[in-house]
């Protein structure tokens, strides 16, 4: 996806020479067995740490601990509770999205952009929320709560039960507002035909997604807009890159962008947090206060998403976190403040405060 090239460039072209470290990158890993094989090969190559973007499990943490490697993951503890309940002394922590903040972006957008009576119809792609994906759960929850607050509606079922449904669900409510939940991964072959069939009814003028779907759904959305003479508002998550640029700069039949809100992660800041946790564990041990909370447990380091709502805003961000420009949001000053070698008194709370302080306005100021 669009995150991979800039993440690798950030590590290879900026982090490696700046902090005198080296990286070995895997090919695409299809399962845990492939991850295990890659880690074993890295052990044979003499690496000091593993940053796991794929499997993130106690099995991998144990393998690393048995061989003296620091282990850091991209993910969350909801899906991998053993990383909190088992004493992996080499485990540097978990880096993931500030899910409540991501969800609030969707809630705020709905408050500003949904109609006064809710007559447009809302189709919500819940992605992997039913399987427990924390980010997808929080976004779906924020959307349902946002609709509830805006229209003063009461759902027949609890929001938790609605989120947990693995079937297409029309959300019963006392105002009879059309709200439909469509679960499933957009990477599955069955996702697009299913969501297309719903959009083609012409009943939904707002399409919200807990995952990145605007690239898959753009064609059918445009076709339905032409057929019914409507403008379907689209809100999703995504990442800086050509896919996002195409989405905002592609106009539908009414002259509107094919997407209205995309909540993006800034790849360099996420990657900087993973590097900082790993580097601090290598220098001071994974049980240092830069990697552990006051309770002595591993920390969930979080990063904020940034809301993009126009092609003009995206133009202002041109060149940010781009391999071609090397103009990284998480520059040396930003990374240094999270490292024990530069800031010996830094704690895990300090690092989280640094990460959570980032907003579009703050980043714009940082980038000059």
Q: What positions do the PLM features span?
A:
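A residue-level marker of the well-folded mature domains of exported/periplasmic proteins
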Residues: 1-368
């Amino acid at each position: 996806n669009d995150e991979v090239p800039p993440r690798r460039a950030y590590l290879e072209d900026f982090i490696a020479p700046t902090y005198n470290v080296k990286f070995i990158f895997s090919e695409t890993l299809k399962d845990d067995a492939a991850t295990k094989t890659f880690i074993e090969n890295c052990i044979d190559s003499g690496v000091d740490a593993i940053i796991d973007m794929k499997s993130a499990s106690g099995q991998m943490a144990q393998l690393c601990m048995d061989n003296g490697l620091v282990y850091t993951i991209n993910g969350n503890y909801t899906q991998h509770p053993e990383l909190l309940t088992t004493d992996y002394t080499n485990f540097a922590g978990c880096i993931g999205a500030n899910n409540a903040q991501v969800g609030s972006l969707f809630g705020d957008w709905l408050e500003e952009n949904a109609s006064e009576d809710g007559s447009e119809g809302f189709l919500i792609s819940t992605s992997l929320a039913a399987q427990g994906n924390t980010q997808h759960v929080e976004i779906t929850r924020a959307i349902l709560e946002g609709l509830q607050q805006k229209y003063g509606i009461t759902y027949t079922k609890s929001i938790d039960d609605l989120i947990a449904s693995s079937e297409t669900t029309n959300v019963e409510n006392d105002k009879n507002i059309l709200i439909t939940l469509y679960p499933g991964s957009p990477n599955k072959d069955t996702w697009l035909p299913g969501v297309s069939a719903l959009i083609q009814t012409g009943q939904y003028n707002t399409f919200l997604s807990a995952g990145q779907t605007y690239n898959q759904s753009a064609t059918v959305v445009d076709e339905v807009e032409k057929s019914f003479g409507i403008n379907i508002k689209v809100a999703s998550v995504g990442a800086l890159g050509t896919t996002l640029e195409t989405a905002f700069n592609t106009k539908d039949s009414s002259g509107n962008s094919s997407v209205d809100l995309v909540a993006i992660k800034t790849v360099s800041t996420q990657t900087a947090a993973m590097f900082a946790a790993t580097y601090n564990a290598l220098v001071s041990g994974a049980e240092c206060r830069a990697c552990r909370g006051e309770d002595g447990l591993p920390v969930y380091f979080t990063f904020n998403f940034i809301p993009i709502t126009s092609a003009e805003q995206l133009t202002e961000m041109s060149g940010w976190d781009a391999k071609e420009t090397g103009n990284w949001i998480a520059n040396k000053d930003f990374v240094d403040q999270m490292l024990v070698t530069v800031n010996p008194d830094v704690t895990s709370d300090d690092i989280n405060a640094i990460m959570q302080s980032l907003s579009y306005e703050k980043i714009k100021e940082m980038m000059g």
